[in-house]
């Protein structure tokens, strides 16, 4: 029996947003600190729309860590499972923005506080009220946090909750690409929902054709594949249905956190409509298209502003 809370496990960090766009790092004179990190962003998107979300992670006992905690709490996210440590610092990600809003990252995270979050800090009883657990690949490097993910996934599966996975590939954080690919493919069968972008598809499957790649993605417990194509729109696939929704053209200034907003708002719709794990594969084409259109609209609003969490709209702003 699943509950109503979205749990998300992984990193929260500070995105350092540049004062100028369309230039390299060495041409930027200043950066503005914004709370980010994909799992935290997903919690925030879900909470902005009025959902209940809880974040499982660890921050440095430092000014950046406390800034993140304050801002996540201001979003309404449950932080009762968030820890602090003086053994490592809060992670930083310096962002370089192109003129079209696309970005590259430079990370300071060797190790960061989140990577020291251990499986012993996970209590399976937390998941009694879990609608879903969401995770990404950034924190799946060899660290205590990797094994905390396995503990959380096991507890969520045992509780009957949906498990959602967005690989959110960040190549500079891994020793080599083969290790990253192998890790994603190891965790993929443990999930019920996979969110993957057009930029990630070929790396993980060897083909840029989503239709050809689907047999490699529908493995293990995967029931729903969300395939995002930036400004070209998004697809949703079950084994029996396919939905597509285009994106409305907007002037994007910063795409940081857009994919997180997409999956966070998609999960919010599933919870709103009482879609549990055993109902995912029964979603109709019409319902998939409806959900995709809403999440595309959510992202369209987000990318017109700087930052991730700061840019996410409320439900009233979506009307």
Task: Walk through the language-model features, giving the residues of each.
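Structural alpha-helical scaffold elements that stabilize or flank donor/cofactor-binding regions
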Residues: 125-126, 186-187, 218
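Short beta-strand scaffold segments in enzyme catalytic cores
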Residues: 44, 92-96, 233-236
């Amino acid at each position: 029996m699943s509950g109503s809370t979205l749990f998300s496990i992984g990193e929260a960090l500070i995105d350092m947003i540049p004062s100028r766009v369309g230039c390299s790092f060495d041409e930027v004179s200043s950066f503005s600190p914004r709370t980010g990190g994909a799992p935290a962003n997903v919690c925030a998107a879900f909470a902005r729309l009025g959902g209940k979300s809880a974040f499982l992670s660890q921050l440095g006992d430092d000014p950046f860590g406390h800034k993140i905690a304050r801002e996540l709490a201001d979003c309404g996210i449950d932080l009762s499972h968030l820890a602090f440590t003086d053994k490592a610092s809060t992670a930083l990600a310096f962002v370089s923005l192109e003129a079209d809003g696309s970005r590259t990252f430079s990370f300071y995270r060797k190790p960061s506080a989140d990577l020291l979050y251990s499986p012993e800090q996970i209590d399976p009883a937390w998941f009694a009220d879990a609608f879903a657990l969401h995770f990404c690949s950034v924190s799946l490097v060899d660290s205590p946090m990797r094994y905390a993910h396995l503990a959380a996934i096991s507890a969520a599966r045992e509780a009957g909750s949906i498990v959602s996975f967005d690989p959110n590939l960040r190549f500079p954080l891994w020793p080599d690409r083969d290790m990253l690919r192998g890790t994603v493919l190891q965790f993929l069968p443990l999930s019920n929902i996979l969110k993957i972008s057009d930029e990630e598809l070929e790396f993980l499957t060897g083909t840029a054709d989503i239709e050809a790649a689907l047999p490699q993605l529908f493995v293990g417990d995967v029931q729903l594949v969300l395939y995002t194509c930036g400004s070209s729109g998004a697809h949703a696939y079950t084994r029996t249905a396919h939905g597509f929704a285009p994106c409305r053209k907007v002037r994007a200034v910063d795409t940081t956190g857009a994919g997180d907003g997409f999956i966070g708002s998609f999960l919010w719709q599933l919870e709103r409509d009482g879609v549990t794990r055993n109902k995912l594969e029964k979603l109709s084409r019409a319902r998939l298209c409806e959900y995709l259109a809403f999440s595309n609209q959510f992202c369209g609003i987000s990318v017109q502003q700087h930052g991730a969490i700061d840019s996410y709209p409320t439900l009233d702003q979506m009307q």
